[in-house]
């Protein structure tokens, strides 16, 4: 579904302010990312205990929940974005969010509004089937995360991967890092040996130089905390900064 053009995936976590100005900013931020080269959008549904996230995105989750963001409001956002946004979109959230909404109800609604898949970082490979079965029923991909681990485990996860593989660049939580030392090329080779599927690298990528290096070894890069930080720093005025940032990342990997 995600094809071979996958390169830049911005992660957008919304702050949850309910004023009209903030609503417009959220729409504009996503559209700015797409207009400046994003091949896929990852939308976060906030959760009170986002264990895979570093302080920047944890803070965004807290602000979103405090501001009244709900799963249904995120679905409404996606429905409105789909009037003109055609690139793939996936959710990043946690198992309890889906459980509390109801797995069947969540997947059905996600498909209805135009989502393409979801990432559940706290669901281990061995426990994914109850989500994957329902997701497949509604045409959604449950995206697999592969962290630096044994060759056997990477191969096992890769065989059943759908959509694209989220290659975790570093152990730990999300957040900007000064350097990435994991041998991403070797990880991607192991995945490709099992299945012809796009591989995107995330966790820690924040500079054009890092993006260029990672994109040379994989099919795409996932940028999260750096974009969320722009939203946090500039608030309703963040859109031009997102435009400039996404363009710089895209230009680095063309």
How does the language model describe each region?
Residues 1-16, 79-83, 254:
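N-terminal amphipathic alpha-helix/helix-capping segment at the start of soluble metabolic enzymes
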Residues 2-8, 48-57, 69-79, 99-105, ...:
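Active-site-adjacent beta->alpha loops and helix N-cap segments on the catalytic face
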Residues 13-17, 41-43, 89-93, 118-120, ...:
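Hydrophobic faces of well-ordered beta-strands that scaffold small-molecule active sites
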Residues 15, 33, 44, 110, ...:
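Conserved, mostly hydrophobic/aromatic
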Residues 23-33, 149-159, 201, 205-221:
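Catalytic cores of alpha/beta
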Residues 37-39, 110-116, 135-142, 159-167, ...:
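Glycine-enriched alpha-helix->loop->beta-strand junction motifs that scaffold or abut catalytic
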Residues 39-50, 115-119, 124, 169-175, ...:
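Glycine-rich phosphate-binding active-site loops on the catalytic face of alpha/beta enzymes
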Residues 40-41, 45-47, 56-120, 253:
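Active-site beta->alpha loop and helix N-cap motifs at the rims of alpha/beta catalytic domains
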């Amino acid at each position: 579904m995600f094809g071979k053009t996958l390169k830049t995936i911005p992660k957008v976590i919304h702050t949850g302010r309910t004023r009209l100005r903030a609503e417009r900013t959220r729409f504009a931020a996503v559209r700015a990312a797409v207009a400046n080269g994003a091949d896929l959008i990852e939308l976060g549904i906030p959760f009170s205990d986002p264990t895979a996230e570093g302080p920047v995105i944890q803070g965004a989750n807290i602000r979103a929940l405090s501001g009244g963001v709900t799963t249904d409001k995120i679905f409404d956002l996606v429905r409105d974005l789909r009037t003109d946004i055609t690139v793939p979109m996936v959710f990043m959230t946690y198992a309890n969010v889906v459980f509390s909404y109801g797995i069947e109800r969540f997947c059905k609604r996600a498909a209805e509004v135009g989502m393409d898949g979801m990432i559940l970082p706290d669901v281990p490979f061995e426990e994914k089937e109850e989500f994957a079965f329902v997701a497949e029923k509604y045409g959604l991909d449950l995206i697999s995360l592969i962290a630096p681990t044994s060759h056997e485990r990477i191969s096992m996860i890769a065989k059943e991967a759908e959509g694209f593989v989220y290659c975790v660049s570093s152990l730990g939580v999300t957040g900007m890092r000064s350097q990435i030392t994991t041998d991403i090329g070797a990880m991607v080779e192991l995945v490709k040996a099992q299945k012809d599927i796009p591989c995107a690298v995330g966790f820690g990528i924040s500079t054009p130089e890092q993006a260029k290096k990672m994109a040379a070894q994989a099919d795409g890069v996932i940028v999260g905390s750096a974009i969320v930080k722009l939203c946090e720093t500039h608030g309703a005025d963040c859109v031009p900064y997102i435009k400039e940032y996404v363009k710089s990342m895209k230009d680095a990997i063309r």
